[in-house]
From Swiss-Prot:
Family membership noted in the UniProt record: Belongs to the prokaryotic/mitochondrial release factor family.
SMART domains: PCRF
Record has Cytoplasm as a keyword: yes
Protein name: Peptide chain release factor 1
S-S bonds: none
Main location: cytoplasm
InterPro entries membership: PCRF (IPR005139), Pep_chain_release_fac_I (IPR000352), Pep_chain_release_fac_I_sf (IPR045853), Prokaryotic/Mito_RF (IPR050057), RF-1 (IPR004373)
Function summary: Peptide chain release factor 1 directs the termination of translation in response to the peptide chain termination codons UAG and UAA.
Record PTM text: Methylated by PrmC. Methylation increases the termination efficiency of RF1.
Entry annotated with the keyword Cytoplasm: yes
Residues where N5-methylglutamine is found: Q239
Gene encoding the protein: prfA
Pfam families according to UniProt: PCRF, RF-1
């Protein structure tokens, strides 16, 4: 590996890994569950890099040995041929390992391990847009099942003809944000609605927002900025005074963000859920502002996370999904069943390629 800066990074990672391993055996740490979990998680995040680096080091030693055998076997054509073959195989293996290590050393998004709130809003297209929003709720719920993630419906506004005007899902599990962060944007569908008698293709949209979950330490909300009213779970209004008002309608006055939460059984639980959603929305706004502030710096071609960015078109007639950031098509029927892993991995790969190109450019100018 010619790049000395990569070797320096790998040696630093290996040293950190060994130090974490040592600390995990410390009685003061083993007796502190919180600290033990934090250190174990940090160590686990470095394990793949360290293991790959060890394989690379061993392969380098093997390559030196194979080259030495090749050099000394001039009088033994058969042995020389075997040594030449081993040299070629090891050089190919080392090149692959170096590609893997370069990717493993890329800066990690600190949000990647977060759980998320996934908000889907019907866009243009009337009733069909709401039905499409409902289809996307099912798509992401099915995908979450394949990942062994836990999905909860936090808030919903159902449409008269089916689907949702708006729905917010909470998705919990391993590396949820890292996989779903590229889903943010406008999802356009082209299909013949069930209600369309003439068979004309309609175009509708739904907007997806991916909001990492945050706690009250990360986002401070002044209680004076909150306007909160309660209603029965069926919605505001009505005359049934005997039914407990469990629904919560919350407005954040500085931003105008409104959250209506009805899914929990008690008013207290709905209030906590509404505040949880509000924190995520405010944090998402902060992230969007930061992205705008660094517009002169790198912006991923895979997507800025902007809600106004059209990222995909789902064409039912041609059984085709087009991801406009990738300029790539996928089979639609699998996608609708929640099989979006190939699309997600393609987005991750493109993002990695961009980061690698940026890293190489930075080294050239250093």
């Amino acid at each position: 590996m010619a790049e000395s800066y990569l070797l320096d990074k790998l040696q630093s990672v290996e040293q950190t890994y060994k130090e974490l391993t040592r600390r995990l055996a410390d009685p003061d740490v083993t007796g502190n569950p919180g600290e033990l979990h934090r250190l174990a998680k940090s160590r686990a995040s470095l394990e793949e890099t360290v293991n790959t680096y060890e394989i690379w080091q061993k392969s380098q030693e093997d390559l030196i040995g194979a080259k030495q055998i090749f050099k000394e076997s001039a009088s033994d054509p058969e042995l020389r041929e075997m040594a030449a073959l081993e040299v070629a195989e090891l050089e190919e293996k080392i090149a692959t390992l170096e590609d893997q290590l370069t990717i493993l050393l890329l800066p990690r998004d600190p949000l990647d391990e977060k759980n998320i709130m996934l908000e889907i809003r019907a866009g243009t297209g009337g009733d069909e847009a709401s039905i499409w929003a409902g289809d996307l709720v099912r798509l992401y719920s099915k995908y979450a099942e394949t990942q062994n993630w836990k999905v909860s419906l936090l808030s919903e506004s159902q449409a008269d003809m089916g689907g949702f005007k708006e729905a917010i899902l909470e998705i919990k599990g391993d590396n949820v944000y890292s996989k779903l962060k590229f889903e943010a944007g406008v999802h356009r569908v082209q299909r013949v609605p069930l209600t369309e008698a003439s068979g004309r293709v309609h175009t509708s949209t739904a907007t997806v927002a991916i909001m990492p979950e945050v706690d009250d330490v990360e986002v401070h909300i002044d209680p004076k900025d909150i306007e909160l009213t309660t209603a029965r779970s069926g919605g505001a209004g009505g005359q049934n005074v005997n039914k407990v008002e469990t629904a919560v309608d919350l407005i954040h006055k500085p931003t105008g963000i409104r959250v209506f939460c009805t899914e929990e059984r008690s008013q207290l639980q709905n209030r906590e859920r509404a505040m949880q959603i509000l924190r995520a929305k405010l944090y998402d706004m902060k992230l969007q502002e930061q992205q705008e502030a660094v517009s002169s710096m790198r912006r991923s071609q895979v997507g800025t996370g902007s809600r106004s960015e059209k990222i995909r078109t789902y064409n039912y007639k041609d059984n085709r999904l087009t991801d406009h950031r990738l300029n790539q098509n996928f089979s639609l029927d699998r996608i609708l069943d929640g099989d979006i892993e190939e699309v997600i991995q393609s987005c991750i790969a493109k993002d990695q390629q961009e980061k690698l190109a940026e890293l190489a450019a930075a080294q050239e100018t250093a």
